[in-house]
Each structure stands twice: as C-alpha cells, then as structure tokens.
Amino acid sequence: MFVSATLPRSTRQVGAWIELELGLVYESRAGLIARLQRLGLEYHKPDIIPRKLNKEKQQAFIESYDNLLNALADNEAVLFVDAVHPTHAARPAGCWAPSCEKLAIEQTSGRQRINIHGAIDLATGQTRMIEVVTVDAVSTIRLLESISALYPMLVLIHVFLDNARYHHAKLVQQWLARPGRRIKLHFIPPYCPHLNPIERLWGLMHRNVTHNKCYATCAQFADATLGFLRETVPRNWADLCDSVTDNFRIINPKDFRVVT
C-alpha cells in the first residue's frame, strides 16, 4: 500500500494520494488520522540501530553479566565506564507552558565542549567523574585509579566498558598488569551502547542540566554538569536509580524493517 511503500511524512501527503487515487476527500485532518489508525497505521519515528549488531554476542554478554552478579562476593563491586562530551550550547526541549507565553533560550556565544571520563556503581549510585582535555589511555588510567581509591577495602572491582581503542591501549594493559591491581576489565560487545547503563546516565544528565537551560559561560556549564554527576546523582540515587538500570534487552535487526 502507499503508506508502507513510501513512508509519507505528513497526513497531507496521504490525503493527497487518497484524493488522487480513490477520489475521496477528508474534510478534517482528525478524520483522516482516525481512518489511518483504524487501518493499523501510526505516526512514529524510526529507531536508530547500529549496522553490525550481533544477537548472539548480546545474549552471551547478558548471560555472562547475570552469572557474574549472581556469584559476586561481598568484597567485590561492579562499575560501568564511558566517556561523554557535553557541548556548551542551548538544547531546547518540549515543555508545558502558559499559552500566552512565547518561550526562548539565549544562545551561547560559542560551542565549547567538556570531556568527561566517568564511572558509576549501579548498586550504590557512587560515581567517579574526571574532566580531561582528551579522553585517551592516560585518562583511562586516571579513572581506574580513582575507582580503586573509591573502594580501598575491596578485593576485586569489575569494570565494564566499550571497545574504544584507548581502553585497549598498551599503556592501560601495562598499568593493569602491575602487582596489587584489583581491577578486571570486561568489554561490552561492539556496537552495543544499549548494554552500557551509563549511557542512560548521560541522558539523565541532559534532561536535568542542559535541556531548556542557559549557562553564561562554559565554566558555569561545566560546574553544573560535573556537580550533577558527582554530587546530585549519588545523593539522590534512590530517586534516580530506576532511570539508570541494567535491565538489558537484545536488539535484533531482524525484528525491524530497516529503511534504506
């Protein structure tokens, strides 16, 4: 049918096709929408999925992670690591407001960004967030050292992270190989950011810090961002934890009609 074949962006396009092909004219947009819904159609935005997703690797990772948690000793911990690069720029987001008001956000004078290499413990909400000039092997080691300092009494700290080159760097491997290191790295399957809960923390950060907010300087923006991640999240973890979970799901490209 026309809708399935062309994926029209507007009801106007659908109405024009119906009038041209069937000779029917809908007097109202609401009436046309009701008809489309009765035909099993809906207006929605396609999801974005990575090109090289592997269902079996996702399943194996989730099973391995569940087994680790089930066998986790009291003197062990699990953290998730990632980098994020918030930009000092206005980020408008939909909101409720009085109908008589026309809303606006002042644009910033530039588009500076801050680089954060961070970690979160989902069990406690404790975070480690370091601001760096460049996210690389050196910042990875700094973050791992900060994690070790957070848990001086633990025997083993499991750190889950993505396959960025700097996470695999020789410098990082040499640091891990030194006597007394208590960190074990676990790599999330490639192209699977949905298997790293800290990605959800970044979304929470944007909703609370950047959406519909204006910061006069990048320094103020950095203070607000790092303050949220370092202080607000751990302090309010009981209220925030449901937004940053390890409730993993498998994304199978075969479940989607991939638009080309």
Task: Please describe what each predicted stretch is.
Residues A60-E145, D246, I251-T260:
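Extended, low-complexity cationic-aromatic segments
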Residues M1-S28, L72:
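A short, amphipathic alpha-helix used for macromolecular contacts
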Residues E27-G40:
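Major-groove recognition helix of helix-turn-helix-like DNA-binding domains
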Residues K55, D162-N163, K170, H186-T210, ...:
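RNase H-like two-metal-ion nuclease catalytic core shared by retroviral integrases
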Residues S139-I157:
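Short, basic/hydrophobic alpha-helical segments
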Residues V14, L32, D82, G118-A119, ...:
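Generic structural signal for small/hydrophobic residues in well-ordered secondary structure
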Residues G31, D74-E76, I198-T260:
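C-terminal anion-handling pockets and recognition modules
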Residues K102-S109, A177-P197, C214:
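RNase H-like polynucleotidyl transferase catalytic core
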